[in-house]
Amino acid sequence: MSLPAVAVCIPARNEAATIGNIVTEVAELVEQGVVADLVVVDDNSSDATGAIAREAGARVVRSGAGPGKGQALQQAVAATDADVLVFLDADVVNFSAGYVTALTATLLADPARKLVKASYRRPLNGQPEEGGRVTELVARPLLAQLFPELATISQPLAGECALTRDLAERVDFDDGYGIEIGLLIDTHLAYGRNAIAEVELVGERIHRNRPLRELTVHAREVLAAVLARAGTAMPELAELRSGP
Protein backbone atom coordinates (compact mmCIF):
# COMPACT_ATOMS: atom_id res chain seq x y z
CA MET A 1 0.00 0.00 0.00
CA SER A 2 1.49 3.32 -1.07
CA LEU A 3 1.76 6.23 1.32
CA PRO A 4 -0.35 9.35 0.71
CA ALA A 5 1.33 11.97 -1.44
CA VAL A 6 2.54 15.00 0.50
CA ALA A 7 2.68 18.55 -0.84
CA VAL A 8 4.38 21.42 0.95
CA CYS A 9 2.65 24.75 0.39
CA ILE A 10 4.32 28.04 1.28
CA PRO A 11 2.57 31.39 0.87
CA ALA A 12 5.20 34.13 0.65
CA ARG A 13 5.10 37.88 0.29
CA ASN A 14 8.35 39.84 0.29
CA GLU A 15 10.31 37.09 2.04
CA ALA A 16 13.42 37.13 -0.15
CA ALA A 17 15.68 36.97 2.90
CA THR A 18 14.36 33.62 4.15
CA ILE A 19 12.48 31.80 1.38
CA GLY A 20 15.62 30.40 -0.27
CA ASN A 21 16.80 28.43 2.74
CA ILE A 22 13.31 27.08 3.46
CA VAL A 23 12.80 25.89 -0.10
CA THR A 24 16.30 24.37 -0.23
CA GLU A 25 15.56 22.33 2.90
CA VAL A 26 12.22 21.08 1.58
CA ALA A 27 13.66 20.39 -1.89
CA GLU A 28 15.92 17.79 -0.30
CA LEU A 29 12.79 15.97 0.92
CA VAL A 30 11.48 16.06 -2.64
CA GLU A 31 14.69 14.45 -3.87
CA GLN A 32 14.35 11.78 -1.17
CA GLY A 33 10.78 11.00 -2.22
CA VAL A 34 9.33 12.13 1.11
CA VAL A 35 7.55 15.11 -0.45
CA ALA A 36 5.82 14.84 -3.81
CA ASP A 37 5.25 18.53 -4.54
CA LEU A 38 6.64 21.85 -3.35
CA VAL A 39 4.52 24.90 -4.14
CA VAL A 40 5.34 28.49 -3.28
CA VAL A 41 2.58 31.01 -3.89
CA ASP A 42 4.21 34.36 -4.51
CA ASP A 43 1.65 36.69 -2.98
CA ASN A 44 2.31 39.75 -5.14
CA SER A 45 5.82 40.28 -3.79
CA SER A 46 7.68 43.44 -4.73
CA ASP A 47 11.05 41.77 -4.13
CA ALA A 48 12.72 38.66 -5.59
CA THR A 49 10.80 36.15 -3.46
CA GLY A 50 9.41 34.23 -6.44
CA ALA A 51 12.67 34.09 -8.37
CA ILE A 52 14.64 32.92 -5.33
CA ALA A 53 12.08 30.22 -4.53
CA ARG A 54 12.12 28.95 -8.11
CA GLU A 55 15.91 28.88 -8.22
CA ALA A 56 15.97 26.90 -4.96
CA GLY A 57 13.68 24.23 -6.37
CA ALA A 58 10.06 25.24 -5.80
CA ARG A 59 7.20 25.33 -8.25
CA VAL A 60 6.13 28.96 -8.01
CA VAL A 61 2.56 30.10 -8.53
CA ARG A 62 1.98 33.82 -8.85
CA SER A 63 -1.06 34.90 -6.87
CA GLY A 64 -3.79 36.12 -9.18
CA ALA A 65 -5.97 37.39 -6.36
CA GLY A 66 -5.49 40.30 -4.01
CA PRO A 67 -2.88 40.00 -1.29
CA GLY A 68 -3.76 37.72 1.60
CA LYS A 69 -2.56 34.48 3.12
CA GLY A 70 -5.94 32.78 2.82
CA GLN A 71 -6.16 33.46 -0.90
CA ALA A 72 -2.59 32.28 -1.37
CA LEU A 73 -3.21 29.01 0.47
CA GLN A 74 -6.39 28.35 -1.48
CA GLN A 75 -4.37 28.75 -4.67
CA ALA A 76 -1.75 26.36 -3.33
CA VAL A 77 -4.37 23.73 -2.52
CA ALA A 78 -5.84 24.09 -6.02
CA ALA A 79 -2.38 23.84 -7.60
CA THR A 80 -1.63 20.35 -6.26
CA ASP A 81 -3.53 17.08 -6.01
CA ALA A 82 -1.60 15.69 -3.03
CA ASP A 83 -3.48 13.84 -0.29
CA VAL A 84 -1.64 15.59 2.56
CA LEU A 85 -0.85 19.29 2.65
CA VAL A 86 1.84 20.84 4.81
CA PHE A 87 1.57 24.60 5.25
CA LEU A 88 4.72 26.51 6.19
CA ASP A 89 5.44 30.14 7.01
CA ALA A 90 8.03 31.83 4.82
CA ASP A 91 9.69 34.07 7.41
CA VAL A 92 11.35 31.46 9.65
CA VAL A 93 15.06 32.13 10.03
CA ASN A 94 16.10 28.76 11.48
CA PHE A 95 13.85 26.44 9.46
CA SER A 96 14.54 22.72 9.41
CA ALA A 97 13.18 20.02 7.11
CA GLY A 98 12.30 18.20 10.32
CA TYR A 99 9.26 20.48 10.55
CA VAL A 100 7.77 18.73 7.54
CA THR A 101 8.58 15.17 8.56
CA ALA A 102 7.34 15.65 12.13
CA LEU A 103 4.05 17.19 11.05
CA THR A 104 3.45 14.57 8.36
CA ALA A 105 4.33 11.59 10.55
CA THR A 106 2.02 12.79 13.31
CA LEU A 107 -0.88 13.27 10.89
CA LEU A 108 -0.46 9.86 9.28
CA ALA A 109 -0.04 8.05 12.61
CA ASP A 110 -3.81 8.13 13.20
CA PRO A 111 -6.37 7.90 10.36
CA ALA A 112 -8.84 9.93 12.44
CA ARG A 113 -6.55 12.96 12.38
CA LYS A 114 -7.34 15.82 10.04
CA LEU A 115 -5.07 18.58 11.34
CA VAL A 116 -1.71 18.65 13.12
CA LYS A 117 -0.42 21.93 14.50
CA ALA A 118 3.21 22.69 15.28
CA SER A 119 4.32 23.55 18.78
CA TYR A 120 7.64 25.16 19.67
CA ARG A 121 9.42 27.66 21.88
CA ARG A 122 9.20 31.24 20.65
CA PRO A 123 11.94 33.55 21.97
CA LEU A 124 11.72 37.33 22.14
CA ASN A 125 14.60 39.68 22.91
CA GLY A 126 16.75 36.82 24.16
CA GLN A 127 14.06 35.41 26.44
CA PRO A 128 13.20 31.83 25.40
CA GLU A 129 9.52 31.85 26.37
CA GLU A 130 8.47 35.47 25.77
CA GLY A 131 7.43 35.23 22.11
CA GLY A 132 3.92 34.66 20.84
CA ARG A 133 2.36 37.71 22.47
CA VAL A 134 -0.93 37.58 20.56
CA THR A 135 -1.10 33.85 21.26
CA GLU A 136 -0.77 34.23 25.01
CA LEU A 137 -2.74 37.45 25.47
CA VAL A 138 -5.57 36.92 22.98
CA ALA A 139 -5.82 33.54 21.26
CA ARG A 140 -5.43 31.10 24.14
CA PRO A 141 -7.63 33.01 26.61
CA LEU A 142 -10.37 33.25 23.96
CA LEU A 143 -10.21 29.54 23.21
CA ALA A 144 -10.31 28.67 26.90
CA GLN A 145 -13.46 30.76 27.30
CA LEU A 146 -15.35 30.00 24.07
CA PHE A 147 -13.93 26.68 22.84
CA PRO A 148 -12.54 25.04 26.02
CA GLU A 149 -11.87 21.76 24.23
CA LEU A 150 -9.10 23.58 22.36
CA ALA A 151 -7.55 25.20 25.43
CA THR A 152 -4.72 22.65 25.50
CA ILE A 153 -3.44 23.68 22.06
CA SER A 154 -0.26 25.56 22.95
CA GLN A 155 0.30 27.31 19.61
CA PRO A 156 -3.11 27.95 18.02
CA LEU A 157 -1.62 30.63 15.75
CA ALA A 158 1.21 28.46 14.42
CA GLY A 159 1.48 28.77 10.66
CA GLU A 160 3.13 25.36 10.35
CA CYS A 161 0.58 22.57 10.12
CA ALA A 162 -0.32 19.41 8.22
CA LEU A 163 -3.84 18.64 7.09
CA THR A 164 -5.76 16.26 4.90
CA ARG A 165 -7.05 17.28 1.50
CA ASP A 166 -10.66 16.68 2.46
CA LEU A 167 -10.31 19.17 5.31
CA ALA A 168 -8.58 21.73 3.08
CA GLU A 169 -11.39 21.49 0.54
CA ARG A 170 -14.14 21.62 3.15
CA VAL A 171 -13.21 24.79 5.05
CA ASP A 172 -12.89 28.39 3.95
CA PHE A 173 -9.60 30.07 4.80
CA ASP A 174 -9.79 33.47 6.46
CA ASP A 175 -7.79 36.00 4.50
CA GLY A 176 -6.17 37.85 7.38
CA TYR A 177 -4.43 36.97 10.61
CA GLY A 178 -7.40 34.88 11.68
CA ILE A 179 -6.54 32.11 9.23
CA GLU A 180 -4.70 29.81 11.63
CA ILE A 181 -7.13 29.98 14.53
CA GLY A 182 -10.06 29.86 12.12
CA LEU A 183 -8.77 26.62 10.59
CA LEU A 184 -8.27 25.16 14.07
CA ILE A 185 -11.81 25.95 15.20
CA ASP A 186 -13.38 24.89 11.89
CA THR A 187 -11.64 21.51 12.13
CA HIS A 188 -12.95 21.06 15.66
CA LEU A 189 -16.50 22.00 14.64
CA ALA A 190 -16.46 19.76 11.56
CA TYR A 191 -14.65 16.68 12.86
CA GLY A 192 -14.30 16.98 16.65
CA ARG A 193 -11.38 17.53 18.98
CA ASN A 194 -9.92 14.08 18.36
CA ALA A 195 -9.23 15.06 14.75
CA ILE A 196 -6.65 17.58 15.94
CA ALA A 197 -3.15 16.88 17.26
CA GLU A 198 -0.09 18.94 18.08
CA VAL A 199 3.55 17.98 17.65
CA GLU A 200 6.46 19.68 19.35
CA LEU A 201 9.23 20.71 16.99
CA VAL A 202 12.76 20.57 18.33
CA GLY A 203 14.34 23.86 19.33
CA GLU A 204 13.21 27.45 19.06
CA ARG A 205 11.32 29.00 16.18
CA ILE A 206 12.95 32.27 15.21
CA HIS A 207 11.15 34.60 12.85
CA ARG A 208 10.51 38.27 12.27
CA ASN A 209 9.04 39.78 15.43
CA ARG A 210 6.94 42.91 15.03
CA PRO A 211 6.88 45.82 17.48
CA LEU A 212 4.00 45.76 19.95
CA ARG A 213 2.21 48.64 18.21
CA GLU A 214 1.98 46.59 15.00
CA LEU A 215 0.23 43.70 16.72
CA THR A 216 -3.10 45.52 17.09
CA VAL A 217 -4.41 44.41 13.69
CA HIS A 218 -3.20 40.86 14.34
CA ALA A 219 -5.00 40.70 17.68
CA ARG A 220 -8.20 42.22 16.31
CA GLU A 221 -8.40 39.78 13.39
CA VAL A 222 -7.79 36.80 15.68
CA LEU A 223 -10.54 38.10 17.96
CA ALA A 224 -12.92 38.52 15.02
CA ALA A 225 -12.25 35.00 13.72
CA VAL A 226 -12.96 33.40 17.09
CA LEU A 227 -16.06 35.46 17.84
CA ALA A 228 -17.50 34.78 14.39
CA ARG A 229 -17.26 31.04 14.98
CA ALA A 230 -18.69 31.38 18.47
CA GLY A 231 -21.72 33.20 17.06
CA THR A 232 -20.80 36.44 18.81
CA ALA A 233 -20.85 39.81 17.10
CA MET A 234 -17.54 41.59 16.78
CA PRO A 235 -17.64 44.78 18.86
CA GLU A 236 -16.66 48.05 17.29
CA LEU A 237 -13.07 49.16 17.85
CA ALA A 238 -14.30 52.09 19.97
CA GLU A 239 -16.00 49.64 22.34
CA LEU A 240 -12.83 47.59 22.66
CA ARG A 241 -10.83 50.70 23.48
CA SER A 242 -13.28 52.04 26.04
CA GLY A 243 -13.52 48.79 28.00
CA PRO A 244 -15.77 48.27 31.01
Map each language-model feature to its residues:
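Structured catalytic core of nucleotide-sugar glycosyltransferases
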Residues: M1-F147, A162-D174, I181-P244
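Active-site phosphate-binding and catalytic loops of NTP-dependent enzymes
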Residues: L150
